Design a protein with these regions (language model features):
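Phosphate/dinucleotide-binding and metal-coordinating scaffold of catalytic cores
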Residues: 1-253, 257-258, 271-358
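Glycine-rich phosphate-binding P-loop
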Residues: 261
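Conserved protein-kinase catalytic-loop segment immediately C-terminal to the catalytic Asp
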Residues: 264, 269-272
């Protein structure tokens, strides 16, 4: 059997279950999927392994809170391998709200415009499953399961409203407060960023943000881009600085100022133009529910975005302001720290460090 890997309505590659492969549109391949046209047995095995791993990555991760309940609700196994998870993702064509790739079987009569999640409604039942861990029966699981593939450990779900999709993130009152407070601070600086607001779901606090992807723009994680660069013998950070140094440096500045210690390689990356499958800049800065950690000293934690170098968050932020300045557009209102006076003192101290470094 052959699978066709699709980018919107175009077939970019064909792959058999034995690893035979034909790449049709190399420039439109997923960044983190490597397929090689070869008769070599080992390379064909690698093709199959890479394909199933890529498909599995488009489904919820098993270490997600409530993951077992979610899997039960869509009738899936609780203990699954990459291949089994891939089969679950393939059952709904590996659809995603993060990009426009999908998969179909050869000669299957189906179009992206008929099934893509940007244009077709989702059941509100998904929100219950993802956020509260309820046992529910989801009849249209082929459209629902993928909407949990947002990465990370915190319960989250996409909710469709009249003006588009919104991400609701749970994780407890403290995580929500941290994310919303960090967002209020970041808005005082010139940076592409996701705006987080506080809301309620079933009498529990959630942070709410609008989707940044669409049928025109996709998100590619740093992890995926690193796979792509490695296979081209490029230095990933060099390519990112070449593409969008200001956004990279602002990320390091703001993560330092708000004490975000969780900037791992799945929650930052590129915004890609789907017309060309080429990156246009870093995607909007997001994910602050681990802000105000290791926030009792000016140094901060180790910076996770500087490649193999060993820098503290302070050192990375100082390097950043010396390259692009602080780019503060308005003062941070003191009232935002009303419930956290110790955080206010640390923020002001870190802000002074960066101003003095310019």
């Amino acid at each position: 059997m052959f699978y066709e890997i699709m980018h919107r309505e175009s077939c970019v590659a064909q792959l058999s279950t034995t690893g035979e492969c034909r790449v049709c549109l190399e420039d439109f391949m997923p960044y983190d999927l490597v397929l090689v046209e070869s008769d070599d047995f080992d390379e064909r095995i690698n093709n199959v392994t890479n394909f199933y791993y890529w498909c599995a990555s488009r489904m919820l991760t098993l270490d997600r809170t409530y993951a077992k309940e979610i899997l039960n609700s869509i009738g899936a196994s609780q203990s699954v391998t990459d291949r089994e998870r891939a089969q679950i993702a393939l059952s709904y064509h590996c659809l995603s709200l993060l990009d426009v790739f999908w998969v179909k079987e050869e000669n299957e009569k189906i179009r992206f415009e008929d099934i893509n999640l940007f244009a077709h409604s989702l059941s509100n039942a998904l929100v219950d499953i993802a956020l509260r861990g309820h046992q529910m029966t989801v009849t249209n699981a082929h459209l629902l399961a993928n909407d949990l593939s947002t990465g990370g450990l915190y319960p989250k779900a996409w909710v469709r409203k009249e003006d588009g999709f919104y991400l609701y993130k749970d994780g407890g009152r403290e995580a929500v407060e941290r994310e919303v407070l960090a967002s209020k601070i970041c808005r005082c600086f010139d940076c592409h960023q996701v705006l987080y607001e506080q809301g309620m779901f079933e009498n529990e606090p959630v942070s709410i943000s609008k989707i940044m992807t669409s049928q025109r723009y996709s998100l590619v994680t740093y992890a995926a881009y690193d796979v792509y660069c490695t296979n081209h013998d490029w230095n990933t950070l060099d390519k990112i600085l070449e593409l969008d140094a200001p956004s990279y440096y602002m990320m390091n500045i703001l993560d330092y100022l708000v004490g975000n210690t969780d900037r791992h390689w799945e929650n930052w990356g590129l915004l890609v133009d789907n017309e060309t499958n080429q990156p246009i800049r870093l995607h909007d800065l997001m994910d602050f529910n681990r802000a105000f950690q290791q926030y009792d000293t000016p140094e901060g934690a180790n910076c996770l975005t500087v490649g193999k170098r060993h820098l503290s968050q302070k050192d990375a932020a100082v390097e950043a302001v010396r390259n692009i300045g602080l780019n503060q557009v308005r003062q941070v209102e003191q009232t935002v720290f009303s419930e956290h006076p110790a955080w206010k003192a640390t923020f002001e101290e870190r802000l002074r460090v960066l101003r003095n470094a310019m």
